[in-house]
Amino acid sequence: MPITAYLQLIKPLLLNANIYKTVQLLFLQYQWSPEQISFRLKHEKKPIQISYATIYRGIYRGFLEEGKLSPGQRGVARKLRHRGETRHKNGCIETRGKISHHISERPEQANQRERIGDWEADTVASVTGKACLVTLVDRKSRYLLCEKVAKKDSISVKQAIIHMLKDSRPKTITPDRGKEFSRHEEISKALNDVQFYFPEPHQPWQRGTNENTNGLLREYFPKKQDLTEIKPSLIRDKALILNQRPRKCLNWKSPFEVYFNISLHLT
């Protein structure tokens, strides 16, 4: 398409200063997808309205670049998320404490995402350094809790989970099968006897909510980055960004809004 014809296509919207500024802020700073931007603007009934197709055209044509990227930074189009292979591989068996409840025994309310308080648990580690992130994601709201621990062992993970959930009343926890969750019985006793339900080995889709959220975290904390020097305040900031990002599966509400049952002005 000739550039003049392309500019005629986007001029009514992305060449509007207010619309351009809003789209650029939400896409570049908060990493919202074009769909999230478009449908959240509609959800909040903003006077600024733009289709996600128009935003995609602007991205792929480099219209949102405007020379704002620092040397070595990825181009805007490469910020669009693409799914890769899961990190779990067959042939590796972990040792852990006795598994008392299988995921097939998990209450139907948890399976159907009918209530707040059913959590999925995992860790996010790097290939360098011993530190890792312990992540908890509420199944209904997709609300994320995240805390860094000095090393990926059962004691550190136990302490982090208890710390993150001590002020709530979790109903169930579905963790990864790794040995770092071997102290699940101790966690259960500390959290009002919350029940753990373990998935099948090497089937991360049984904890798909957490796996997807960990993928979003990887955008901020790549696998090659040593987490040891990452400040807790930065982790909290990135978790807040994800918790305030609208989701299609939540009818364009954010996890924060669903978890706390409130409405926010995010745009």
Give the residues covered by each predicted segment:
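Secondary-structure boundary/capping micro-motif
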Residues: M1-T209, E219-D226, L240, R247, ...
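Catalytic phosphate/metal-binding cores of nucleic-acid and nucleotide-processing enzymes, i.e., regions
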Residues: L234
